[in-house]
Amino acid sequence: EITTRLVGSEMCIRDRTCAVLYGLIAIYVCCRYRLFLFKGISWFKIRPILMWGVPLIPHLATSWIKQGGDRYIINYYYTFAEVGIFSFALNLSNIIDMIGSAFNQTNSVSIYQVLSSNLDDKWERLQRQTKAIFIVYTIGVVAVLAVCSILIPLVLPRYAASLPYFYLLALSGYFQCIYFLYTNYLFYYDKTKDLMMITFFSSLLHLMLSMWLTQYSLYYTCLIYVFLKFIMVALVVYRANLLLNKYVKT
C-alpha cells in the first residue's frame, strides 16, 4: 500500500510539472507571436464562426449520450459477462463506422470540389459519386460481416455469442456510413444547426427508449440503435436532398 501511494504521488508530481511546463510554453508562444492581440476582429467576423461551430458541440456530444448512457443502463440490469459480450459486439460494429469515416474523408473533398465548381453536370456527378460510395460501403459491410462470422467462432469462441448482437448493430453501422455521406451537404451549406437538432434529439430519444426497453433484452437495445439510426439518416437525407434540389438540381 505504501509503495502504491509513493508511485501515485510521484506520478501526480510529474503530471503537474508537465502541465506547468506546457502552460509556460503556451504563454511564451502566445506572447512571442502576439496571439493575445485581437485587433481587427469584430462581431461580424466572429458571428458566422460561432453560428457554424457552436451547434456542433451538442452534435458531437451525442456519441457520449448514447454509448455512455447505454453503458450505465446495461451495467445496472445485466451481469459482467453479458455486458462484455454486448460491448464486444458494439466494438465490432465500430469497425464499420471507421470504414465509413475513412472513405468519407476522401469522398467529402470530392463532393466539395463538385459543389464549388461551375460545372453544368453537378447533379449527374454527385449521383454517380453517391452510387459508387454506396457500393463501396456495401462491400465493406459485407466483408466485415463475413470475416467476423468466420474468425470469431474460431479465434475467440467465448465471444461467439456476440454475433447475433453484431449482425443487428452492423446494420446500424451501415446507416452510419450513409449518414457520413449526406452530412457533407449539410456542412457545405452551413446547416450545422439542422444537423444538431436531428442528432441531439434522436440521441435523447435513444436514451429514453434504452431506459425503458434495455431491461427486457439486449436485443431491444440493438434494435434501438438500428431504428433511431435509420430515423436520423432519413431526416439527414431528406434535408440534404432539399438543399441539392434548391442549389444544384435547378
Residue ranges of predicted features:
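Interfacial segments at transmembrane-helix termini and the short loops linking adjacent helices
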Residues: A146-Y174
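C-terminal transmembrane helix end/exit motif
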Residues: T17-I41, Q105, L181-Y185, K193, ...
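Helix-loop junctions and terminal segments of transmembrane helices
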Residues: A89, S93-L119, F187-Y188
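Alpha-helical transmembrane segments of polytopic membrane transporters and translocases
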Residues: T17, D70-Y72, G84-G100, K131
